[in-house]
């Protein structure tokens, strides 16, 4: 397979409108010349998306200590953070864009990587052994509910009401065959091969680094993101989840934040 073809290295620019053009073309871009505070991250969303914004909640810190995120078992600054989508704690109403603003980088490690989900579907469709998976991803509903969060039973590949294709990438705990599946073994095989192929691609694509005052803007419906292990425990980023008028199913109910703190199911 042509796994070296599925990576995206965002172009850099200091022009927010150029960022919007690049994101629409490539799925991602890097905006330079920024401040390094959480409000600077939110301002990026306002400058790039303008009146297309529906919501730009407070930024969440991304560092070794974390904040309100549920961390996958075994993940630390010493391990790779595998490719994933952000915000699926909100179910199918996950944010359509994400922003990651660098406050402090690690000199050693911490490189980011992006896998183009649209391109991955094309590459897998051409493979004799994996060609069955892309159609299955678009037709087989699975359980995509993060533990304790908003429920989601849907396909990994969806087309939104406005025609936008949306993909979701999660770990083996949060994406699993549905209890009512007619063929759970085949559904599990679909999920494993999808996940393993994306993880394998990470070793074949170029990586890049964010430096202080730079932010990447990523189409969260199209690209999956991750980062390598790093040495400096003081590495610090600000993450902003963004909902625009082009999001698939509108805003989640209630207060929003750029992490899962407000997505938990309310006790009955």
Language model segments and positions:
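N-terminal non-catalytic cap/leader segment that marks the start of a structured domain
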Residues: 1-66
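Active-site environment of non-heme Fe oxygenases that use a 2-His-1-carboxylate facial triad
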Residues: 2-13, 24, 61-268
């Amino acid at each position: 397979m042509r796994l070296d073809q599925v990576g995206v290295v965002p172009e850099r620019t200091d022009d927010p409108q150029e960022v919007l053009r690049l994101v629409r073309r490539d799925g991602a871009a890097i905006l330079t010349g920024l401040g390094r505070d959480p409000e600077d991250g939110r301002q990026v969303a306002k400058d790039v998306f303008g009146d297309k914004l529906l919501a730009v909640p407070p930024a969440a810190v991304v560092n070794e200590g974390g904040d309100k995120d549920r961390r996958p078992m075994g993940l630390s600054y010493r391990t790779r953070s595998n490719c994933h989508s952000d915000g699926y704690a909100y179910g199918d109403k996950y944010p359509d864009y994400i922003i990651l603003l660098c406050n402090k980088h690690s000199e050693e490690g911490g490189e980011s990587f992006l896998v183009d989900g649209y391109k991955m579907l094309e590459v897998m469709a051409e493979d004799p052994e994996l060609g069955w998976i892309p159609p299955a991803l678009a037709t087989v509903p699975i359980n995509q509910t993060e533990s304790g969060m908003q429920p989601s039973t849907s396909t990994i590949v969806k087309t939104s009401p406005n025609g936008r294709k949306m993909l979701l990438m999660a770990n083996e705990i949060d994406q699993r065959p549905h209890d009512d599946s007619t063929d759970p073994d085949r559904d599990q095989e679909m999920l494993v091969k999808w996940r393993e192929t994306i993880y394998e691609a990470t070793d074949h694509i170029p990586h890049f680094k964010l430096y202080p005052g730079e932010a990447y803007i990523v189409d969260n419906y199209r690209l999956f993101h991750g980062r390598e292990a790093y040495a400096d425990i003081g590495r610090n980023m600000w993450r902003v989840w963004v909902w625009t008028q082009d999001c698939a199913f509108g805003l989640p109910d209630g207060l929003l934040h750029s992490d899962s703190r407000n997505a938990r199911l309310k006790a009955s």
